[in-house]
Amino acid sequence: MPTTVWLVSHAANAALRAGTFPRAPVAGDDADEALDARSIEALAAWRERWSARLLRGERDGEAPRALTSPAAIARASAHATGFAAAASCNALADTVFGAWQGKRLADLAREAPEALEAWTRDPSFRPPGGGESFDDVRARVGAWLDAMPEAGPDLIAFTHSSVMRAAILHALGAPSASFRAIEIAPLRVAALRRAQHGWVWLAARD
């Protein structure tokens, strides 16, 4: 059977709800990416709705292989939904935000409004300080997808909205500027299936 990849956006937490860019990982300090009561409740509801199906898989009961972004919030989301053995995968990592890491959107809107506007509209824009553009993310995600065999085990991948946008646009062969037209909320699922000509975006059944 063709490979199917189930992409899951990680849970929201206090930092995400406050509109704060993720900080650079610091050994032993994942406070900004910790789950809170609201995210734990949302994850429990997601697990009730989705995990039995995904743990069972769609190949006569064969469970998919689980992967996760290296980010603590993605790993915690995988663990809380029954995929504790998910392996870390760098291709699923969040966008690198450079000097914007740890900053609030509201503060950037005051301090650097033109740069923030460019980031929301231009897929080639890189945040200062070594940040990644959407085009950069799309290139790494597209390379990861295209390296997969046409037939292989299904995958479930806990990742970030930017990675999911990149994967969907890669599957569709759509221009990167279309990233503005895709909204992905926390704990949403997108499915991609391998095909002879590339990838097909499947409507995930909730």
Predicted regions and their residues:
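Conserved histidine-centered catalytic loops in small-molecule metabolism enzymes
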Residues: 54-91, 117-118, 170, 193-206
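Acidic, low-complexity terminal tails and accessory targeting/binding regions
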Residues: 1-5, 46, 57, 88, ...
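Generic beta-sheet signal
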Residues: 4-5, 64, 151-162
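Active-site-proximal alpha-helix that buttresses catalytic centers in soluble enzyme cores
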Residues: 2-83
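Phosphate-handling substructures
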Residues: 81-140
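A short, acidic, amphipathic alpha-helical segment used as a generic capping/interface helix at domain edges
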Residues: 140-149
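A structural signal for the main folded, soluble domain(s) of proteins
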Residues: 126, 133-134, 152, 187, ...
